[in-house]
Amino acid sequence: SDVYKRQVHVGMTNIPYQSDLEYLKGYSEDLGVPFVHYETFFDPSTDTRKSPCFLCSWNRRKALFTVAKEQGCNKIALGHHMDDILETLLMNITFQGAFSTMPPKLVMRKFEMTIIRPMCLVHEADLIEMARIRGFRKQIKDCPYESLSNRSNMKEVLYSLEKMNPEARYSLWKCMTNIQEELLPGMNEHDL
């Protein structure tokens, strides 16, 4: 099958979350990868049960699906790294009572799209160091909802866990595939 690469940037017109589009476009084109900029918006009052961060993320994801379909693509590679995945795991456990996170590969049949996360085993610190070495320009982040986000709190939790155990991130990663159902409440027919 053919591989079509695109660098897609989805902007939110109603949030002052800025990226240097010329820089991103230039970098992408230097690699021979076409750059697509797509703008959308969301109204945080449409669903007060969901956080603005969730609504923004979901609307950006839908926009990515739209662009992918328009470009004739059926696979989207996202830049989530190991820290993102572990922070999401901790958020879902803490706030949703669910043992779930962002998988490295997710087939979304409803959209006929597959999401992959090729950097899922890379530490955020390693990406920051690589960006520094390569001289990448830091992008502007000025989201009015960022201070309300639980993700920054979970980043601190992950850091605290690593202070207690330097291998904590690897233990968290391993626990996602090392579920001992017989030792969990509600998983055994004889429980409660």
Which positions does each model-derived feature cover?
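Generic structural signal for well-ordered, non-membrane alpha-helical segments
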Residues: 4, 17, 57, 147-150, ...
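Alpha-helical elements of Rossmann-like donor-binding domains used by nucleotide-donor carbohydrate transfer enzymes
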Residues: 23, 63, 156-157, 171
